[in-house]
């Protein structure tokens, strides 16, 4: 199985600031990388698919980049509602595996 690694398990940033969350794959996943957001109430939403394509309804404050084995999610102009856990998933090879998640806390 392809191993997905998010080296930062938690981070905090201030309202209005920018954060970047990284994810690495144990082998080339050819840009088949998705980012999910899990809110504290358990709600899960797809944010970005195929590295950089924004899912319908997701604000343009969210963006993704990367290639081969290294990927990132950037959130600009942080809002209180961005407090959540963000996880990457590779969709290149079954089973489609997830990173361990990065929990983001927003400082007022």
Curated annotation (Swiss-Prot):
InterPro entries: Ig-like_dom, Ig-like_dom_sf, Ig-like_fold, Ig_sub, Ig_V-set, IgV_Light_Chain. Transmembrane segments: none annotated. Residues 35-49 are annotated as: Framework-2. Keywords: Adaptive immunity, Disulfide bond, Hybridoma, Immunity, Immunoglobulin. Residues 98-107 are annotated as: Framework-4. GO terms for cellular component: immunoglobulin complex. It comes from the Eukaryota. Residues 50-56 are annotated as: Complementarity-determining-2. Disulfide bonds join 23-88. This is Ig kappa chain V-V region NQ5-89.4. It comes from Mus musculus (Mouse). The lineage of its organism: Eukaryota, Metazoa, Chordata, Craniata, Vertebrata.
């Amino acid at each position: 199985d392809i191993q997905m690694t998010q080296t930062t398990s938690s981070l905090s940033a201030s309202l209005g600031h920018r954060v970047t969350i990284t994810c690495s794959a144990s082998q080339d996943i050819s840009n088949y990388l998705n980012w999910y957001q899990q809110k504290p109430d358990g709600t899960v939403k797809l944010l970005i698919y195929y590295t950089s394509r924004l899912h319908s309804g997701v604000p343009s404050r969210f963006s993704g980049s990367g290639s081969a084995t290294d990927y990132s999610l950037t959130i600009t102009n942080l809002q209180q509602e961005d407090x959540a856990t963000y996880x990457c998933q590779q969709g290149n090879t079954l089973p489609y595996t997830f990173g361990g998640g990065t929990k983001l806390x927003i400082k007022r």
